[in-house]
Structures are given as C-alpha cells and as structure tokens.
Design a protein with these regions (language model features):
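Long, Pro/Ser/Thr-rich low-complexity/intrinsically disordered regulatory tracts in eukaryotic proteins
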Residues: 1-48, 63, 75-77, 81-260
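Alpha-helical support elements that line or immediately flank enzyme active sites
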Residues: 67-73
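Conserved phosphate/anionic-ligand binding catalytic regions in large, soluble enzymes, centered on
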Residues: 50-67
C-alpha cells in the first residue's frame, strides 16, 4: 500500500492507499518512510513555513490526506451541495475520482484537506477523519430517507442499473460508473444481497481503458473499448450468480465498506 513518485508534482510524493477509513494507519506508514528518507536526503525546510515544496499549495507539512467517498444518498436527496459547502467552511475540499481537476463520476467524491500550512500532520489527519465520519452519518441518514420516502423509485433505479450492467453490449466508463453507483447503493441497502462490494470495486478498476487494452494485448479504439468493457462486466456478474429479481431483501444500514 506504499509508493513513491519521483519528480511528479513535487520532487518526492510518498503515498499510502488503503481500503476503508484507515487514515491513521496510512499516515503512520508514510511518516516512517519520510523519517527514513529525511536522514539521507536534504529536504528544503524553513523554520517558519515548514517544508518548501515545488507546488506552493503543499508548503508547510506537505501532507495531503484524502478519503474517497460514495455519496449517492446525498446526491439523490439533493443535500450534497449543502454538505460540500460545509466542507469548504471547515478547511476541506472535494475533487473527483482521479483527484485534482477531475470530474465527479458515479457519485464518488474525494475529500481532502485544503491547506497544509499552520497545523501538524496529526491535526490534519484527525480533522479529516472526524469530518468524514460526520459525512458518513449524513449519507447513512440520506439513504434511509430514500427508503422511507421514495422506496419504489429507489428500487427501480437500482434494478434498472443492475439490468443494464448484466445485459448491455456497450458501456462507456462514465456510464459504467453511474450504473455501478446505483448497484452499490442497492448492495448497501440489502436490496441486492448477493453482490459483494469487492466485486463492484473490481469492476471499477479493471474496466478502465488501460486495463482493457492490457487484457486485449493491443490498443482499443473507443467503440471497441466500450464493447470489451460491457463484455467484462457481463462475465464478472454472471460468475457472481444471477440476482433473483423477486427477492429484494430488507432495508438495512450501509455496510462497513460503504461509503468509501
């Protein structure tokens, strides 16, 4: 879960990625590596401003802590704008699936600290962790509101998404992500009880253009890539077992894996 990028946005970028809300654990890994490198490399450091990074927005601690969250409940109940505005008021910001400059697809929001100056790394991580847990509570409540006030519409949206994924012959990546968002919501609400979050994560990763081209062993034009993507999704879902359309299960809280 640990990687180092050299001469990217800054001279060094140490990165730890983990599933679930494990910010402290991820930070500890990066911190240990940073200490080891710091004994060998002459980091540019100022007693007042902290680490002097190539990118001005990283000056200070140089730390960017992020959490990728799936927030369909807040989007569907039209509460997301209020929540995102609240994040900006407490020193956090949001980006799309691929980070800075990327669009939000599939109701995935990357929430991170906005500034790195004037606080310790521990303070930044603790603050993000605390606010993210509040957002999870808002999302959980929004999902229950959907079940209580718009259950039929919500179930229809979920099953339509599942049906398209099961039988579509062509899917763009954006279309896939939006459909997976509906199915992921259905899984967390126990409306699609036979599907695992692991499977949905797998579909998110291995249907991206480079993965499809690696599997095909050649470059794929967009239309052919969309066809390969749909075929891969059908194959994965068929091996997971068909979900019986009659049994929608009972409404429940989100799983421990969601939202992330």
């Amino acid at each position: 879960p640990l990687s180092v990028m050299v001469n990217e946005e800054d001279h060094l970028r140490l990165q730890s990625l983990m599933s679930g809300l494990r910010l402290q654990e991820a930070w500890s890994l990066v911190d240990r590596l940073d200490e080891d490198l710091g004994r060998e490399l002459p980091y540019a450091f100022h007693h007042e401003f902290g680490f002097l990074t190539s990118c001005p927005t990283n000056v200070g601690t140089g730390l960017r802590a992020s959490v990728l969250m799936h927030l369909p409940g807040l989007v569907l109940t039209k509460e997301i704008t209020k929540v995102l505005h609240g994040l900006s008021q407490v020193g956090l910001t949001f980006r799309g699936l691929y980070g800075e400059g990327s669009e939000v697809v599939g109701n995935f929001f990357q929430v991170s600290n906005q500034t790195t100056l004037g606080k310790t790394e521990e303070d930044l991580v603790d603050h993000l962790d605390r606010i993210v847990r509040q957002v999870i509570q808002y999302e959980t409540h929004a999902r229950q509101v959907l079940l209580r006030d718009a259950r039929q519409v919500t179930e229809d949206k979920i099953w339509r998404a599942y049906g398209l994924l099961r039988y579509a012959r062509s899917l763009t990546f954006e279309e896939l992500m939006n459909l997976l968002s509906g199915v992921r919501l259905g899984t967390s609400l126990k409306l699609l009880p036979e599907l695992r979050v692991y499977t949905l994560n797998k579909l998110m990763i291995f249907t991206q253009p480079a993965h499809l081209e690696q599997a095909a062993g050649r470059d794929l034009p967009p239309a052919e890539s969309d066809s390969h993507r749909a075929a891969y999704v059908r194959r994965v879902l068929s091996t997971e077992g068909a979900v019986q359309s009659e049994g929608t299960g009972s409404a429940g809280n989100q799983t421990g894996e969601d939202p992330e």
